[in-house]
Structure formats: C-alpha cells, structure tokens
UniProtKB/Swiss-Prot annotation:
Gene Ontology biological process terms, A to Z: glutaminyl-tRNAGln biosynthesis via transamidation; regulation of translational fidelity; translation
EC number: 6.3.5.-
Keywords (A to Z) from UniProt: ATP-binding, Ligase, Nucleotide-binding, Protein biosynthesis
Domain of life from the UniProt record: Bacteria
Gene Ontology MF terms: asparaginyl-tRNA synthase (glutamine-hydrolyzing) activity; ATP binding; glutaminyl-tRNA synthase (glutamine-hydrolyzing) activity
Entry-linked HAMAP family: GatC
Gene responsible for this protein: gatC
Name by which UniProt lists this protein: Aspartyl/glutamyl-tRNA(Asn/Gln) amidotransferase subunit C
InterPro entries according to UniProt: Asp/Glu-ADT_sf_sub_c, GatC
Protein family: Belongs to the GatC family.
Keyword Magnesium: no
Length: 100
C-alpha cells in the first residue's frame, strides 16, 4: 500500500492537523516507508510462537473483593449516598441524556 499527497492531506484533515504543502510532500515518502515496514512485519512467520503480552511477567496480587461493613470506610452505603442525589433511578444516579 502506498499513499499520495491527497491521502496525506485527508489524514491530516481527519486528525485536525494543519500541514503545509511543503510538509505534505515530505510526509508522503515517510508514510510510505512506515507502511512498507508494517507490511514487512506482516511477512514474518510467527507460527508456533506464543503471543507476548509483556516483556516481564506481571503478577497481580489481588485481594478478595468483599464489601466492608464499616459505615465510615466500607461499602453498603448505597442508600445513604443516593439520599443526596437529586434524581436516583433504580439504585443508581440519574443523569440527563447527553447523547442521542
């Protein structure tokens, strides 16, 4: 895949980046080089290789997910918190719809 000046201009417009005509000309070979490198990565044979999610092993030490019954520091305070809400709905905070 290769890009031309019109494609770079469209990408810049979609990304809301102001690019001059001189910069457009310089970006075309750079983007083509990046895309060629990505295509080259796609040609590597990775059959039998397990995907790596991290360079070093990550072990998360998780605590049990339990509700603390202490009224000052714990959970089980939903009713007390929702008592201050202007429009609670079904046990949750009611908010106005902002997306149609």
């Amino acid at each position: 895949m290769s890009v031309d000046t019109a494609t770079v201009a469209k990408i810049a417009s979609l990304a809301r980046i102001k690019v001059s005509e001189a910069e457009l000309g310089a970006m075309v070979p750079e983007l083509n080089g990046i895309l060629a490198w990505v295509e080259q990565l796609g040609e590597v044979d990775v059959t039998g290789i397990e995907p790596m999610t991290a360079v070093i092993p990550n072990k998360q030490r998780l605590r049990d997910d339990v509700v603390n019954a202490d009224p000052l520091t714990g959970g089980d305070m939903r009713d007390a918190v929702l008592a201050n809400a202007p429009a609670p709905e079904h046990g949750f905070f009611g908010v106005p719809k902002v997306i149609e």
